[in-house]
């Protein structure tokens, strides 16, 4: 049965053909707009503290790397853009933190023994890092 399901996916359904909603030029323009989204220093510090806390938490053997922090910053700016703002708020970071960080960390033996999921540990990290109030320019 599984083989038939997988093989059946080879057939192209005319209704499933996707049409582009923007062209490459428009996409590059949006990318430039996202890069210009403002992040206050307090918001940068919040993002960095969240990521740093994953590197010092005893339940995490390997936390979010500096590259992961940069990815979180970029995605947070994109989230702000999608919400129609030209600045990042803590909620933008919170909205995507679990998704960005969960697959980047390695749980410690202690966390595995306690059957703690990456998500539950990250929620605890978020609860223990003070959120800033500054966001706008």
At which residue positions do the language-model features occur?
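Conserved AAA+ ATPase core "coupling" helix
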Residues: 1-49
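C-terminal helical "lid" of AAA+/P-loop NTPase domains
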Residues: 5, 32, 45-52, 67-81
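Short hinge/gating elements
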Residues: 17, 25-37, 55-60, 105-113
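C-terminal engagement/docking regions of AAA+ P-loop ATPases
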Residues: 56-137
């Amino acid at each position: 049965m599984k083989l038939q399901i997988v093989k059946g996916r080879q057939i192209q359904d005319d209704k499933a053909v996707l049409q582009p909603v923007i062209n490459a030029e428009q996409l590059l323009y949006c990318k430039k707009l996202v890069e210009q989204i403002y992040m206050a220093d307090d918001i940068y510090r919040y993002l960095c503290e969240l990521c740093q806390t994953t590197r010092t938490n005893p339940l995490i053997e390997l936390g979010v790397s500096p590259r992961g922090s940069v990815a979180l910053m970029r995605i947070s700016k994109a989230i702000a853009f999608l919400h129609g703002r030209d600045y990042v708020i803590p909620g933008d970071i919170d909205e995507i933190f679990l998704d960005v960080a969960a697959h980047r960390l390695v749980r410690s033996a202690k966390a595995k023994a306690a059957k703690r999921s990456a998500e539950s540990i990250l929620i605890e990290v978020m609860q223990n890092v003070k959120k800033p109030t500054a966001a706008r320019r």
